Amino acid sequence: MDATPYTTSSTSTALDSPSSLSATMARRWARKLERYCCTCVTYFPLAFVYSMTSWAAYVDVSLSTTPSRVTWLGHSYGFIAVVLYLLANWCYTYAVFTSPGSTTNEYGYSTLPTQAPPTATSFTVKSNGEFRFCKKCQARKPDRAHHCSTCRRCVLKMDHHCPWLATCVGLRNHKAFLLFLIYTSVFCWVSFAGSASWVWEEIMSNTTYVETLMPVNYIMLSVISGIIGIVLSAFCGWHIYLASRGQTTIECLEKTRYLSPLRESMQRTYVNQHTPGQGIALPKYGQQLLDIHQNTIPGVTRPEEGEEMRRMTTPSGSSQRNDLASQHNPELQAGSRRFTYDEMEHIRARKRYEDYLDEQDSTKLPHAFDLGTPRNLLHLFGTNAWLWPFPVCTTIGDGWSWEPNPKWIEARDRIAREREEQRQRERQAGWGPADDDDITPVYTPTWTPPNQQHPQGGAGRHYLQPSSQPQTQRNSNSSSPSFTPSRRTPSKADRILGRDPNMYADDEPVIYGKHDVAMSRLSPAGRTLVVEDDVLNDDDDDDEDYFQDAGRKQEDAEQSALNVVTNGRWGRPAGASGVGLLAHGRPGGARSPISPISPPARGFGGSAKNGEEGRSNDDGVD
């Protein structure tokens, strides 16, 4: 009875020991410190942008109030710099703290829907041909939407994840982001022009500022604003070009998977880095920094979360026959290392061929959502021209339904027709892939012995089922077996191209025992040529038939004459005269094909066996 309280007290003492409490508190403080560090790293770009722009505005204002030999550096210069600074920071703040738009409701069930759900268009699908669905968000992804692993949500019309904004650039903040790039680029060039002009004039005139080490802020502003202006202007110009074409950064860079193996190599590198035992293992902090940059453009620099990764070892086509073959053959399943040489060559050849077709098609297809420069810019900036310079969301559309490019639809239909015509030509040539929907059943005649033709089923009436072949063919094939040609062994080229070696157009297929194509020699005018060998062979056959018919007629005439003379008993061995044997000429009543009369000496040597055989022919005769 005393053991239980003692055990409880000892357990509580062990749990409340100073060492366990200190360890628990240490882990809690470590997790808090880690969260604070991550928050600081996340919002450090914001602090950097605000501080840099504020410092540049301060230097510009001080430069405009300082006496200088540059005449245009006055109060107007300071006013322009301050206006650009305010507009740039306004756009930056709006782009950072405005949601880019998501496919899911951020408020859950706290609010009831006030409008009908939008109708989503689906011009783009996954690599396997299915509708785009995000497994992370458990929601359907419309066109131009992608899942961001950093923001942990699907973003409508996602352009990219900007680390300098600590958020994604999407449908609702794309306009503010583009205005921020424009205002910041102009602000950098204005600051560079003012600070560089002031520094140049002071150095060339050799004024007192050179002797007293002129203000360092002016020199730093000229260098920093020049460098940032060059880089940011190029970036801004590229985004303006994409906006005029109606493209996003992801849509522009996604074409690299057709034009070069860049996308495949990046995905393979990402898989190796995140798979134990493959690739070069990076330190944890190094891998986190690398993931930050790879998360910028999901689907291009890394596999997009929420979607199945494309298989690297199997062809990326949407053929159902390949999927069924991989299910039935474990050697062809993804991740298996049991590949034969022929299978690997076949897979690589198909992959190269499909990549080549995709590359050719990508060069022919225009952008699916390019409606022209005016309409693309109106979609981004809105119809109200007074609100274009300000970071107010005036973008047209809800991000779910998109109007396609008519040229893209026309090109897509044309390429689809060309692909179908190519497949038809390949099938007609005999080496193209077979179409499961267009397979026509071919009747192969087989011979069945008469004693094995039993009706199926039990007792009762059984009716003859109608046959699909003509009556003449049924009669001709009912008593003679059909000839089945031997199948050829597929060659290496046949296995690579996926064709059947027994389906060539220049072969002679046998159907119902006859060739479906008459193989004869033709003249240039299209007439049939007569070959001398064929004529000679035909003459020999005719002579043979003639002699056989003549001998048969003579034999029939002699038989009729003997029947008249012997009163129909020329083949009987009755009596002692042995007339039947004399007439027959050989034992057993076998006739000679040349002459029915043989020497009499052979007739008197008959045996009992011959008599029995002859006696069997005398049934029913008195």
From Swiss-Prot:
Q: Where are the transmembrane segments?
A: 39-59, 77-97, 176-196, 218-238
**One GO biological process from the UniProt record?**
protein targeting to membrane
Q: What class of enzyme is it?
A: transferase
Q: Identify the domain of life.
A: Eukaryota
* Record region (Disordered): 298-334, 419-507, 533-622
Question: Which residues fall in a compositionally biased region of kind Polar residues?
Answer: 313-330, 443-455
Q: Please report the PTM annotation for this entry.
A: Autopalmitoylated.
- Which reaction(s) does the protein catalyse, per the Swiss-Prot or TrEMBL entry? L-cysteinyl-[protein] + hexadecanoyl-CoA = S-hexadecanoyl-L-cysteinyl-[protein] + CoA
Which residues belong to any copy of the DHHC domain? 132-182
Record topology, Vacuolar segments? 60-76, 197-217
Fetch the Pfam families from UniProt. Answer: DHHC (PF01529)
Spell out the molecular function terms from Gene Ontology: protein-cysteine S-palmitoyltransferase activity
Where, per UniProt, does this protein localize? Vacuole membrane
Q: Where is the composition biased (Low complexity)?
A: 466-488
Q: How does it sit in the membrane?
A: Multi-pass membrane protein
Q: What is its EC number?
A: 2.3.1.225
**Entry keyword Transcription:** no
GO CC terms in record: endoplasmic reticulum; Golgi apparatus; vacuolar membrane
Q: Where is the composition biased (Basic and acidic residues)?
A: 302-311, 419-428, 610-622
Keywords attached to this Swiss-Prot or TrEMBL record, sorted alphabetically, are:
Acyltransferase, Lipoprotein, Membrane, Palmitate, Transferase, Transmembrane, Transmembrane helix, Vacuole
**Where along the chain is composition biased (Acidic residues)?**
533-547
Its job = Palmitoyltransferase specific for vac8. Palmitoylates vac8 at one or more of its N-terminal cysteine residues, which is required for its proper membrane localization.
Family assignment? Belongs to the DHHC palmitoyltransferase family. PFA3 subfamily.
Q: What is known of its domains?
A: The DHHC domain is required for palmitoyltransferase activity.
Q: What is this protein called?
A: Palmitoyltransferase pfa3
Q: Which gene encodes it?
A: ptr-3
